[in-house]
Amino acid sequence: MDSTARGHAPLCRTSNQRGLGTRLNPYYQSTPHQPMVQSMSNPIGSYGEQGNAQIIGSSGQVLSTGPPPGLAPVQCNDFDSCYSSCDDISHPSLSRESSDPSKIDDDQTAPMIRYPAPEVVEFATKLGYSTEQLSHVLNTIGVDSRMDDVLSELVKMGLPGGKPENSGKSGSRNSPEPIMTSSASSSSASSSSSHRPIRQSVSIATSSPATSSSTPSKYNPDPSLRAVVVDGSNVAMLHGRKEVFSCAGLRECLNYFLERGHPEVLIFIPQYRREQPRSDSPITDQHILQEIERHIIYTPSRNVNGRRVVCHDDRYILRTAELKDAVIVSNDEYRDLTRENPAWRKIVEERLLMFTFVEDKFMPPDDPSGRHGPRIESFLSKVPVVSSNPLVCPYARKCTYGNKCKFYHPERANGQHMSVTERLMKENQQKKSLGAVKSMQYEMFKNKHAALSRTQSLNVVKQLTENMSQLPPTPESPMQMPRQHMQLQQANSAPWQQHTVVQRHGSSPLTPVNRQMNVYPDMYNMSQQQNHQVLPNQHGVIGGQRPPKMTTTVSQTHLFAPSTAVWGHSELSVGPVNTGSDESLAEVRSRVHFHLCNIFPHDFVESVMAANPEEVNAPVLCELIIRAQKEYRK
């Protein structure tokens, strides 16, 4: 109620409450409405010469003179400016604070607000416990409890399984919950709430009502799913529109894979993201890094003379993905690193998962390898499921669409197309290694049988057998050899000039043989020593016993006549050393070689003719060359 409406002068205030002034002045307790100070406009009382107030009763007599008890003396021009004075200056000598003794007692016994130590909060956060659980434990066992007791209570409570009940009613998650320790008595607790504020234990506030814990409410790890390696810088910068490092994007990405049940999700970010952000690299929601710290791996970084030195975190990402056989979540193609290591290139081609954000929601594609590739479920699993009915490209190897082809190519490993540069490099390497084909082709296509040709034709063997049965036994002369021998002579010339000579050491009528012995005595003795134990029993014609002396009934023509009864090759004939025939064979092979080189590659012709040194038949050599080309292509 206004003081002028009540018809009396304004009061000199010592407190904002009327009841407080009543308790201070015992005179007001007996006459609470009568004592007033006279104002200028309505003189109920007047001031004396020395500034003492005269208290006028209801009948008009002066009750008392002097300052009322509990009130400070005021001058004539020092009325309260709040009521009737136009002066804005308040009373300098008048205290506006409450002098209620009960108020003073309540302020002295107010509860003390104490916060937990930073190391306790950091210790609990790294273990995965929320600040709500830590506040509840410290309110229960006391803020001064030992770390072991705090950990024991946290273990009993368990890890957070879902969203806290009071998370939607809170406002900020930047500071831990204050812990209240009170030593107030029961009398102070029953005092009026208007005299002192009572602070109670409050819960931890969240940055937004939709914020949840770093671990989803339903997390069931699936061992059949691959581990996930997240390029944290790429994800956070894309969520921040490539302007700021948004930690909220990291949390959305982490929750997506944890809800799917991936057993291990690792996020790589540089170490300096934990520090105070600079103006050139802003960070939003930096407190989220503490919430998801269990899944974060900080790559090294340091400051050298005010300059920030950051290690290449992409190498850590690719190396970890190789060790854990994990999927890489990034929109970076790592071209600089795939050129260094072929294994990293294969990882990027086969296990790189791209993504985007749609209204702050992490969203990878359903077909990471293209429209006709595996689905996201098969892509993220350890055992990929291949589509049962893929559409095969009708052009097959002749397809010119390359990577843009929408159909399936079974000849391309893992659906990857070999570029033109890689194909040319591969063909160039094949041409360089073609010099080694000669020896390989020689080993592959040489005759399976021994290089020894037939020593005697069938007709010669038959004639010799008949003559040996008809001849009577005669004592052997001292000039005869102890037994019959067969000798293989090789000329010191090209392989196709090798020939076989059968020599029968017996009586003198074998004139060509004796002449050959006289011409090549040293070679004869050497071959006799080498082949004495090997060749006598090859064909069963000459037995182990020493044969009797034979008269020569085998004609020269019969002995040296060519025969194709077994092998069917005219060059495998029995004959003496003939230099003219060797020259003719070399000429024939040279002519065949010239014509074959006009048809086939020179390397294949050389290798096949070297593997078959006695072959001069052109159709047979052509067949062998074609077979060699087919084997080489396989």
From Swiss-Prot:
InterPro entries: Rege-1_UBA-like, Regnase_1/ZC3H12_C, RNase_Zc3h12_NYN, ZC3H12/N4BP1_RNase_Reg, Znf_CCCH. It is an enzyme of class 3 (hydrolase). Its cofactor is Mg(2+). One of its GO terms (cellular component) is nucleus. GO terms for molecular function: mRNA binding; RNA endonuclease activity; zinc ion binding. Residues 225-377 form the RNase NYN domain. It is found in: Cytoplasm. Expressed in the intestinal cells adjacent to the pharynx. PROSITE patterns: ZF_C3H1. Changing D314A: Loss of ribonuclease activity. Residues 97-106 have a biased composition (Basic and acidic residues). Mg(2+) binds at D314. Its EC number is 3.1.-.-. Keywords: Cytoplasm, Endonuclease, Hydrolase, Magnesium, Metal-binding, Nuclease, RNA-binding, Zinc, Zinc-finger. Residues 1-33, 90-113, 156-223 are annotated as: Disordered. Disruption phenotype: Viable, but exhibit slower development and have reduced body fat. RNAi-mediated knockdown results in increased sensitivity and reduced survival in response to lower temperatures. RNAi-mediated knockdown results in increased expression of the transcription factor ets-4 in the nuclei of intestinal cells, which may further result in changes in the expression of genes involved in lipid metabolism. RNAi-mediated knockdown also causes a defect in the clearance of apoptotic cell corpses in hermaphrodite gonads. Its main location: cytoplasm. The keyword Repeat does not apply. Residues 182-194, 201-217 have a biased composition (Low complexity). A zinc finger (C3H1-type) spans 387-412. Pfam families: Regnase_1_C, RNase_Zc3h12a, UBA_6. Endonuclease which binds to the 3'UTR of target mRNAs and induces degradation of the transcript. Acts together with rle-1 to repress the expression of the transcription factor ets-4 by binding to the conserved ADE (alternate decay element) and RCE (REGE-1 cleavage element) stem loop structure in its 3'UTR, which controls the expression of genes in the IIS and TORC1 pathways, including those involved in lipid metabolism and autophagosome formation. May play a role in the clearance of apoptotic cell corpses. Belongs to the ZC3H12 family. This is Endoribonuclease rege-1. The gene is rege-1.
